[in-house]
Amino acid sequence: MNLSNHFLVAMPDMEDAFFSQSVVYICKHDEDGALGIAINKPSPITMDMIFSATGKNIPFRMQHDSVMMGGPVQVERGYVVHTPIGNWQSSIGVSDNIALTSSRDVIENISREGAVDKILISIGYSSWGKGQLERELADNAWLTVPADEHILFDIPYEHRYAAAFAKLGIDPLALFSGAGHA
């Protein structure tokens, strides 16, 4: 099972302070573990603040967009999920059209026409060690669904959790992750 380019959708009763009601975009999943970016947890940082620090112009449409809190790992670093893949210093291809980049060159070129089409910037990322995500899935902590670019880039972050459940065709209020006992 490879969950790269999938969403993890937290079960409604997840109690973890960070991951409660999270949608995590899985960028890499292999036998060594998984890496993802939470796409619906805003940080206090805006895109305008990021671009002001680089001295580059930000496309007006992104000016007030929130930077996501991608996860609790390496929160001092920025990560960019974007289309198209492009040719950046430190990127991993997630799908045929989406990449995760951690190098500054992608930020410095966003204002350049055609450098990136769609973008989600986060600070930090989410990580699971070998077998950890599989155990959490077996424990019914998460649901999975193939990623959807519309949810990832176009839907406001505060609606992404509901949109991921809608893609699954499930009402989150009807779910309970605990096993039944007779």
Curated annotation (Swiss-Prot):
Signal peptide: none annotated. SUPFAM superfamilies: VC0467-like. Disulfide bonds: none annotated. InterPro entries: AlgH-like (IPR003774). It comes from the Bacteria. One of its GO terms (cellular component) is cytosol. Belongs to the UPF0301 (AlgH) family. PANTHER family: UNCHARACTERIZED PROTEIN YQGE (PTHR30327), UPF0301 PROTEIN YQGE (PTHR30327:SF1). This is UPF0301 protein NMA1550.
